[in-house]
Amino acid sequence: MPKLKTKSAAKKRFKLTASGNVIASQAGKKHFMRRRTKAQIRNLRGTTILCNQEGYNIKKYFLPYGTN
């Protein structure tokens, strides 16, 4: 069976932790920022851990060899 390719877009957007969780950056920071409060903008900084089902789907379909 041939090797599976990792999706390049997923490599750029997601990272795996040592325990196998999937980390992604917060959504909703690209435009329309003027209608958000300063606290909302601050809270959108950084990363978040995806829920179990989303993380499972990312690892299964987009990062086939990232199954720590």
UniProtKB/Swiss-Prot annotation:
The keyword Cell division does not apply. It comes from the Bacteria. InterPro entries: Ribosomal_bL35 (IPR001706), Ribosomal_bL35-like (IPR021137), Ribosomal_bL35_CS (IPR018265), Ribosomal_bL35_sf (IPR037229). GO terms for biological process: translation. Coiled coil: none annotated. Keywords: Ribonucleoprotein, Ribosomal protein. Belongs to the bacterial ribosomal protein bL35 family. This is Large ribosomal subunit protein bL35.
